[in-house]
Amino acid sequence: MLQEKQPNKSIQVVSNIVDIPGSNRPFAVRRDWLFIGGFQHRPNIDAVLFFAKEIYPLLSEHLRDAKFYIIGDKPPAEVAALATERIVVAGLQRDVRPFFDSVKLSVAPLRFGAGVKGKINQSMAFGVPVVATSMAIEGMELKDQEDILVADEPEAFASALIELYQSEELWTRLSENGIGKTRALYSTEAARKKLEFLFSDEHLRSLERPLSGAEHELVLAATS
């Protein structure tokens, strides 16, 4: 979008970065799933309410003993009201590793919003596979069935979640690929290499060459 509005500028994206602790707990000892995100951000409120009202009822008969953890600062009243024995509104957690080390998967049922979603690359960095909407993965270079599962309609989302929850082969593939993709795109090393390239003499010289009668200007766009 920025490039379309500013065709004579060289716009490069330096994404948000995450630590990559990886996973040392196998599929067999994991259970439950989570959503993580701050609730000052309206898309997160909508996503949780959408999941709880439209998707969660489709899961109860298949995953009766599983719990859904909602993690995030300042959950509003409508989110807090979702709490039951199996829906845990955990609020702000200073240390999220115990959750990521125990759950089988993470959900990102976002229906609007923009930018690289930290909830997704953070989950993948812990080796926790994600089920997400197509909106949630925009701009993240993730492939359905390889790095993540993508579904938009409630029935399809529920079906993908159940399959991932029950299939060790699928879970292991997405867990391993997710760690690899996060390391390649969202690690400190990936950001360092991108910045080294952008400020290299070779790249800066290329910006001096005119294109269609105008000179390029380097613009860095950071995502969060």
Model-assigned labels for residue ranges:
Residues E4-N8, Q12-S102:
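Conserved catalytic-core segment of nucleotide-activated headgroup transferases in glycan assembly
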Residues V18, Q40-P43, G115, L149, ...:
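Glycosyltransferase donor-binding loop in the core domain
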Residues I45, R97, K117, Q145, ...:
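Glycine-rich phosphate-binding loop at the start of an alpha helix
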Residues L92, P98-G115, F126-P129:
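Acidic donor-binding loop of glycosyltransferase active sites
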Residues S134-Q145, L149-V150:
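Short acidic/histidine- and often glycine-rich active-site loop of Leloir-type glycosyltransferases
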Residues I148-E155, E163-E168:
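Conserved acidic donor-binding segment of nucleotide-sugar-dependent glycosyltransferases
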